[in-house]
């Protein structure tokens, strides 16, 4: 562990490293009675850049660092997607807003023209992958298999999307082509959750271990064997099985040399 960022808060989840690595966007609360909101951590300070009352979560920086996509839960209990200037100025841009199904966990394309996300049906708990045009709001389905497809992340070159799915009986990490799911590859070998890309590796959690997978993209997607990077216990995240949660507790920078993790501290 090289250091810490931001003050101690009651709860912090969903960390997202800014493209220049100077800041971290998080879903956090200062006090036990608060709801989760979007905060920007820089140095040892924390700045809330929104004024919404509903739960805010699943923050991610745009490729140029000027905007942040995130979800807000409305009064009816449904989560929709919005875009906010990362300096807190102006108002939220509606990315996709409708009743019925949650829209969670956005992921920008490298040119910031589209955002991939997963839907959640509150009645069936089914989750599918969609994407939306930032300019027009037009949506399309990417993956809608049986069961759960969730926590998608677009690769740094925009050609692939990694996600987790229970199509084989337990959560595993898969990669599909983007913007059309024409081919798919299984990456994990013993379960997986929370996929994240660097330029030349795909990372995910297997139980309490962070795994890294090198890959080649000539003629498709060809992953190497997963290698253990470190454990949650080694990084101060505790001994929990990370696969039991839909709330990512880490992020990685573009060159894959630095990670931000959420440490669990005694109260």
Task: For every predicted segment, state its role.
Residues 7-27, 51-73, 93, 97-119, ...:
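Conserved beta-propeller blade repeats
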Residues 41-45, 85-89, 133-137, 177-181, ...:
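Short loop/turn segments that connect beta-strands within beta-propeller blades
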Residues 1-2, 40-42, 197-199, 265-267:
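Short, intrinsically disordered, charge-balanced linker/junction segments flanking boundaries
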Residues 108, 116, 127-134:
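Acidic, glycine-rich loop-and-beta core segments that form the ion-binding/anion-interacting portion
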Residues 30-32, 75, 121-123, 234-236, ...:
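Active-site/binding-pocket entry motifs
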Residues 33-39, 76-82, 124-130, 169-175, ...:
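Structural motif
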Residues 2-3, 45-48, 89-93, 137-141, ...:
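Predominantly a core beta-strand signature of beta-propeller blades
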Residues 201-266:
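C-terminal structured "cap/appendage" subdomains that terminate the fold
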